[in-house]
């Protein structure tokens, strides 16, 4: 959401104009020309703003008429602890009187005109300088009112006031105003940036009186020991100057005290970050001002005696070089003092670091107990070694005694030596005899195995014999020769019955007499007959 002055600048810059002089709101001609440039459609939408805009318009009209209530004088900034409502009301000035006749109409035009604007590029700084008149008289009166606070403050913070004076130029006004939604939701007063040419003297006098009263009230409120926060982004110039100067004074006063150093470390970091953002002049804008209060958490950096990392490095160096009792005591006292003064509690790592590295009474007792345990273990090991050596020496003595007893009870040397030799020779002779028998039996087995054919050889021989017998019987039957007659002539008829001859014709008989003549003799005995070609 854009700021109010940025919206105003865009509204005026987007409309075509011939000259910038009649647009100055201090003159009635400029106001009339701006109001006359609005189209009828826009005029119908001027009063159609939301509830927040109408409420802020009514507040501005009541401010311009001099009517103030307690609800309108709400504090424009929140206290960090939530209890600064009563003290913060005394720091703000009363509403100003109208600087020109139709100020309420001009302010209502500014508020209601937001609905007609569209987002666009930002306006150059030169247009802002034309729209905003010079604010030199106001700055002078404000510097005077700040100087009335105390001469010491003016001498100490001269450079800060000069930097703030440079920042409060017409070109930088656009960066100090809150967005309209935020300002109206917080109940803040809309700052009027317009000043008049002739009536500026009376206004400056009123402002100086109000600022003097506010300065006294600020000193009273700060004397109680409570430091108000920095003013918000939508405060007026004199209130920001007063609050910044008083906060700087309180910052220096707290910087000297050593008791509250640890408690206010986070607030100091936030104040230093905001003061540095205020001193940046033209580079400071609304985004940087919004981000400045958010950096309070990152500003808590422990320095001085509570820097545990530095202490840890020192302790490591002393441990390497050799511990000294005085340095241990000094470092332990420093860490204990910093732990008492520090706002944040000690974490688990820091506690373990303190308990592990500082040689206190418990550390010495634990070290002594460990040393005693090690000494007892060493003594036990020595005792065990001595007992083992004594046991080995005793065993050797017993073995020597047994050997001497055995030597004393042995018989004569001649008889004792001849008996075992004879037994040994007899055993060797029997062993040679058994080995010879075994070799002879093994050779007989080898001969029998070599003489007997293999199984496949026996099967081949049997098949060949059966094939020859079957062929012989077939040839005889084809020639018409009686096989039995042939067998009888051969002298083998008594040993072969008819049944066996029939089985032999089919190739079933497995045995044959070795004395039988060859089967081809009958065929050779009959030379006149020849076998038929079909059978061959």
Swiss-Prot record:
InterPro entries on file: FAM161
Spans traversing the lipid bilayer: none
One Gene Ontology cellular component annotation held by this UniProt entry: cytoskeleton
Biased composition annotated in UniProt, kind: Basic residues: 71-83
Coiled coil spans: 375-451
Region (Disordered): 1-94, 185-234, 246-305, 491-536
Domain of life: Eukaryota
Cystines in this chain: none
Record's compositionally biased regions (Low complexity): 48-64
UniProt keyword annotations, A-Z: Coiled coil
GO BP annotations listed: cilium organization
Protein name: Testis-specific protein 10-interacting protein
Species: Rattus norvegicus
Encoding gene, per UniProt annotation: Tsga10ip
